[in-house]
């Protein structure tokens, strides 16, 4: 009997039918560590799931990827739900993943931590971006479910504490499909609505799945971008959501948010009365101090004799002028005496002053001063300068004598 040969395509198609009809492989959970993770531009996810002995190729299509609450990462331990089949084109056996969860920790808890870390790094939780909650808001927006207990509690508490405030209710879905979109739209509408001073975004308690809308990135960014200050009031005191971290103020419960949003009317009245009394006391103290200062000024020397300081300054200026004149006279007298002394010194050092003491100067015919008998000859004509003129004479005889130093 001749056995019919099958084509490669037929073999792969047969194997695919076998795998698809297997009750275990058609609906299976596989645990392993993710590696070779790659998110394709088409939106499909490709990776390998492995343990210490084996590995299997995995694919997760775009539609299923978009349902994930967390981002798979290289080396993460996962439990993948799906079915085993064969890729006919190359005959490769693959695990087609429909859903996955981190091993040992819930997907929602991991998604919460991943988003929290990412937004924190971006600075969305930074206190420098927190807006101040108004002390007495005139109009408050309540963004919550219109039918839950939270809205009844908030309205009751706010109107009891401060009935003058105006409440604007923006009804939204707080859980399930469409909740994120309605919350984001309500926050955006609240920012366009005129006169809104404050908004409370929240709901009552519930499981993490029921509170999850307030952990979504779109809601967090809408709260961060709001120009209206927002109080986050989600769940009970032990519940924390991403909205709590990004809001301008976190309240443990919706009831607490209502108390934080408005002051107590009675307490506010008491506070205003006490401030009024304190202000009156301060004003009286200030007036008394001012009266005392005014009285002191009225009795002061300057106030009673306002021109005396001017007279004192005038006398001071006159004294200075006298001192200046006296100093100038003293300087003039000193300079006069000094000048006279210098003149006398100059006169005593003048060559002409020797004539007054009986001396004369002898010059030869060339006008040179004769200092020695060696400088003249017999019959040479000389000119003798005296105090009142000159004498012309003729040398008859030259006698040389040795003079003793200091004789004359």
Swiss-Prot record:
EC number assigned by the record: 3.1.11.6
Main location: cytoplasm
Subcellular location: Cytoplasm
GO cellular component: cytoplasm; exodeoxyribonuclease VII complex
Hydrolase keyword on record: yes
CDD domains recorded: ExoVII_LU_OBF
Disulfide-bonded cysteines: none
A molecular-function term among this protein's GO annotations: exodeoxyribonuclease VII activity
GO biological process, one term: DNA catabolic process
Presence of keyword tRNA processing: no
Recorded catalytic activity of this chain's protein: Exonucleolytic cleavage in either 5'- to 3'- or 3'- to 5'-direction to yield nucleoside 5'-phosphates
Subunit structure: Heterooligomer composed of large and small subunits.
PANTHER family the record matches: EXODEOXYRIBONUCLEASE 7 LARGE SUBUNIT
Functional description taken from the UniProt entry: Bidirectionally degrades single-stranded DNA into large acid-insoluble oligonucleotides, which are then degraded further into small acid-soluble oligonucleotides.
Protein name: Exodeoxyribonuclease 7 large subunit
Source organism of this protein record: Alkaliphilus oremlandii (strain OhILAs)
Gene: xseA
